[in-house]
């Protein structure tokens, strides 16, 4: 794996997956085909690497262009592990984040989302979290991390929640676990590009109403970070 001029990524893959990569990942070119392996040149963009990650499991993580092209915003200087987390999320459509408590996962998620929003890949984000931290953690962290973004807390009556969800002014919409069921159809209509679930443990049982509701609001194109 080699990064060339911060524009393209050169990788070597088995021949049996070359066709799948070249037909799925845009801006891919075959450099050299040998008996068992092929060298490919792929445009170094988040969309291309996200597609590539969905096809191939690499021994080492792919380098995210976020590392080169994103200026971290907000009050805090990110730690190395936060940068690594943001880079990982930015090029994985469906991902788990198992960082320990207190390591700044929320900021890592927000920076990755902000990067994709800057590129127009993500327009709106739905954050599903415990009721107790909707404002104290998520809304406040957005103000501290992404001052230029507009968060809305979807809480209260059904009408109150719908007003927040349907308003495109709110780039980040924060809602509690059980509130999702109340406005499920409105969430589907709002067409969120990215759904963030704080604490995947709340959705570990596929037989629960929570899990079934989440499954219904997910679309094939929706990013999901848990």
Task: Label each region the model flagged.
Residues 17-27, 60-87, 91-94, 103-220:
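SF2 helicase/translocase NTPase motor core
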Residues 99:
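The Walker A (P-loop) glycine that initiates the GxxxxGKT/S ATP-binding motif of P-loop NTPases
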Residues 224-226:
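Catalytic metal- and UDP-sugar-binding loop of GT-A-like glycosyltransferases, i.e.
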Residues 1-60:
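Charged, low-complexity intrinsically disordered regions
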């Amino acid at each position: 794996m080699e990064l060339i001029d911060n524009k393209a990524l050169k990788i070597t893959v088995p021949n049996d997956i070359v066709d799948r990569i070249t037909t799925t990942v845009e801006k891919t070119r075959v450099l050299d085909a040998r008996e068992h392996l092929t060298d490919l040149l792929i445009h170094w963009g988040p969309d291309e690497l996200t597609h590539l990650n969905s096809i191939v499991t690499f021994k080492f993580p792919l380098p995210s262009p976020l590392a080169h092209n994103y200026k971290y915003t907000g009050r805090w200087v990110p730690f190395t592990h936060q940068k690594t987390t943001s880079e990982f999320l930015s090029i994985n459509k469906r991902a788990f984040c198992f960082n320990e408590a207190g390591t700044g996962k929320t900021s890592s998620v927000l920076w990755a989302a902000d990067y994709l929003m800057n590129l127009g890949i993500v327009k709106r984000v739905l954050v599903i979290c415990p009721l107790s931290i909707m404002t104290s953690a998520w809304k406040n962290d957005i103000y501290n991390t992404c001052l230029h973004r507009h968060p809305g807390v979807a809480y209260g009556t059904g009408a109150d929640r719908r007003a927040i969800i349907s308003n495109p002014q709110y780039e980040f919409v924060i809602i509690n676990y059980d509130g999702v069921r109340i406005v499920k159809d409105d969430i589907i209509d709002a067409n969120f590009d990215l759904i963030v679930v704080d604490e995947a443990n709340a959705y570990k049982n596929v037989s629960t109403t929570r899990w079934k509701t989440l499954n219904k609001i997910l679309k094939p194109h929706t990013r999901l970070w848990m």
